[in-house]
Amino acid sequence: MALPIVAVVGRPNVGKSTFVNRLAGERDAIVHDEPGVTRDRTYRPAFWQDREFLVVDTGGLVFDDDSDFLPLIRQQAELALQEATAAIFVVDGQAGPTALDYEIAAWLRQLSLPVLVAVNKCESRQMGQVQAAEFWSLGLGEPYPISSIHGSGTGELLDQLITYLPAGETLPEAPEIQVAIAGRPNVGKSSLLNALIGSDRAIVSPISGTTRDAIDTVIEHGGTQYRFIDTAGIRKRTHVAYGPEMFSVHRAFKAIHRSDVVLLVLDALEEITEQDQRLAGHIADQGRACVLIVNKWDAVLDKDTYTINAYRDRLYQRLHFLEWADALFVSAHTGQRLEKIFAAVDAAVEQHRRRVTTAVVNDVIQEALHWHTPPATRQGRQGKIYYATQVATQPPTFAIFVNDAKLFKENYRRYIESQIRQQLGFRGTPIRLLWRSKKPREAAELVAR
């Protein structure tokens, strides 16, 4: 059965993200002293008394501000409450009840949902009881004094919470594919995610950088589970101020690191930038499978049968780190070619996890040597390849045993890699070659195994 969901709501800077981190046992959500810093709703698994549930961290609620984001944040909170089994309303015990707290409480009372009031920042147990008592006036039942920083009081709160959650064991999750959606700000990452999953799950706004956190969404398609990680837009370092956005860039790189495959989203209306190149290099360095997604293709004017080919040529020229990745020309707005993304992801992951027998690898190496022997040095020393074998997957990694690795310069190493790709494919994934020096006797022992 699906895990029950608990929505965490409240006004800005009452400690919602710190509270969620406490429940989840990790420092994952961005915590920073800025109203509305958690713009999207983020899901974290939590456990209490052998019970598992998901905690949804929503943005700080404000009802009377002119900010462009605040209506979107309220909408995200509403969506979280619609799918929740219970809610936790976090308030600030040091500040006492505010007018905004009363507004939020009135809004929550209209919902047919159990609501617990967590009075945060109650660092003293004795004073906490006094501070919490003020919040009876919200009309939501007993307030629970807690300290998200120290963890005090959360046990009593959670004991009450699990009485509202359905009993039952959760089934083990099916194997899933982790997909990071990455790219510069405003290339359409969240719009792409929304189109793929069919709901306004992530905030979408024309203002650059509206998705600050790395958000997970799990869906099932064609019998396979996909965990989509929608990352914040990645800017040049000189354009990233200290604060939440800097943390989000770090989070985006973490999302790439924990993914199986990265959808690198590009804007068809803009040229490939230096930041696109740096991001492509990072994906390759991390050894992640990748699919290039050229978004907004519907907005490209005067297209003909040669337009895609011309763009693809420029794309691979600029992003030579990812010349092994397939490119899809799509529109999140119209849905053009979106159905091909799942197949491309599946194919890339299959190649990323692929293993080839040692006999096949050595057949490819011998064929490559037949057409192009390693060049000799000025002193007449000739490079020799004794043996090759695949030693790892994700990404596919091959050990090449040679007489002296220093004799094989970059050009010849690229030639061997290109021959492996030409003969064996591995489209959609980087491959790595480990050049290992071995004495002839050691090499003979390896071959004999």
From Swiss-Prot:
The keyword Ribosomal protein does not apply. Keywords: GTP-binding, Nucleotide-binding, Repeat, Ribosome biogenesis. GTP 1 binds at residues 10-17, 57-61, 120-123. The keyword Phosphoprotein does not apply. It comes from the Bacteria. Residues 4-169, 177-353 form the EngA-type G domain. Pfam families: KH_dom-like, MMR_HSR1. One of its GO terms (molecular function) is ribosome binding. GO terms for biological process: ribosome biogenesis. Residues 354-439 form the KH-like domain. GTP 2 binds at residues 183-190, 230-234, 295-298. InterPro entries: G_ENGA, GTP-bd, GTPase_Der, KH_dom-like, KH_dom-like_a/b, P-loop_NTPase, Small_GTP-bd. GTPase that plays an essential role in the late steps of ribosome biogenesis. Associates with the 50S ribosomal subunit. Belongs to the TRAFAC class TrmE-Era-EngA-EngB-Septin-like GTPase superfamily. EngA (Der) GTPase family. This is GTPase Der. The lineage of its organism: Bacteria, Bacillati, Cyanobacteriota, Cyanophyceae, Acaryochloridales. The gene is der.
